C-alpha cells in the first residue's frame, strides 16, 4: 500500500509538471506572436523608430552623432527625416537628393543642401547642425 501511494503521488507531480510546461510553452508562443518573430519588433506601417544611437567627439571637439533607424515605409517611400525625427518620405526626394524637400529641420531653422549634395545643414542664428547621409 505504501509503494502504491508513493507512485500515485509521483504520478500526480509528473502530471502537474507536464501541465505547467505546456502552459508555459503556450504563453511563450502567444506572447511571441504578439511581438512578432523572435528577435524582431513590428513597426507600425508608415513609421520609423531609432534602434541605436551613437555619440562621440572628434579631435576638434565637435560632437558627432549617428543613429540607426528601422522603418516600415509604404510603397514609394524610403527612410528619411522630418522635423529632425526619422520618418518615411517620398523616394524621389532621396533619389534626387532634394534633402530640404523632406523638411528635415526644426521649426525656425533654415535648411541648405550641402555643396556636394551628400546631406543638408540646419541653421538657426550661429548654430549649425550638419547631416550627411550614409547607406
From Swiss-Prot:
Phenotype on disruption: Mutant mice exhibit enhanced mechanical and chemical hypersensitivity following inflammation and nerve injury.
Provenance organism: Mus musculus
Keyword set, alphabetical order: Secreted, Signal
Protein name (record): Chemokine-like protein TAFA-4
Tissue-wise expression: Expressed in a descrete subset of dorsal root ganglia neurons called C-low-threshold mechanoreceptors (at protein level). Expressed in LPS-stimulated monocytes and macrophages, especially in polarized M1.
One GO cellular component term noted in the UniProt record for this chain: glutamatergic synapse
Main location: secreted
Protein task: Modulates injury-induced and chemical pain hypersensitivity. Ligand of FPR1, can chemoattract macrophages, promote phagocytosis and increase ROS release.
Span of the signal peptide: 1-31
Family recorded in the similarity comment: Belongs to the TAFA family.
Pfam families on file: TAFA (PF12020)
Subcellular location field: Secreted
Name of encoding gene: Tafa4
Induction details: Up-regulated in LPS-stimulated monocytes and macrophages, especially in polarized M1.
Amino acid at each position: 500500500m505504501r509503494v502504491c501511494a508513493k507512485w500515485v503521488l509521483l504520478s500526480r507531480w509528473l502530471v502537474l509538471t507536464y501541465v505547467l510546461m505546456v502552459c508555459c510553452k503556450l504563453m511563450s508562443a502567444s506572447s511571441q506572436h504578439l511581438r512578432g518573430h523572435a528577435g524582431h519588433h513590428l513597426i507600425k506601417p508608415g513609421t520609423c523608430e531609432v534602434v541605436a544611437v551613437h555619440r562621440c567627439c572628434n579631435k576638434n571637439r565637435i560632437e558627432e552623432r549617428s543613429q540607426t533607424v528601422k522603418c516600415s515605409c509604404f510603397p514609394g517611400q524610403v527612410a528619411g527625416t522630418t522635423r529632425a525625427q526619422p520618418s518615411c518620405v517620398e523616394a524621389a526626394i532621396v533619389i534626387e537628393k532634394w534633402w530640404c524637400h523632406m523638411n528635415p529641420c526644426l521649426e525656425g531653422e533654415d535648411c541648405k543642401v550641402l555643396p556636394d549634395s551628400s546631406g543638408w545643414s540646419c541653421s538657426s542664428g550661429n548654430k549649425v547642425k550638419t547631416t550627411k547621409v550614409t547607406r
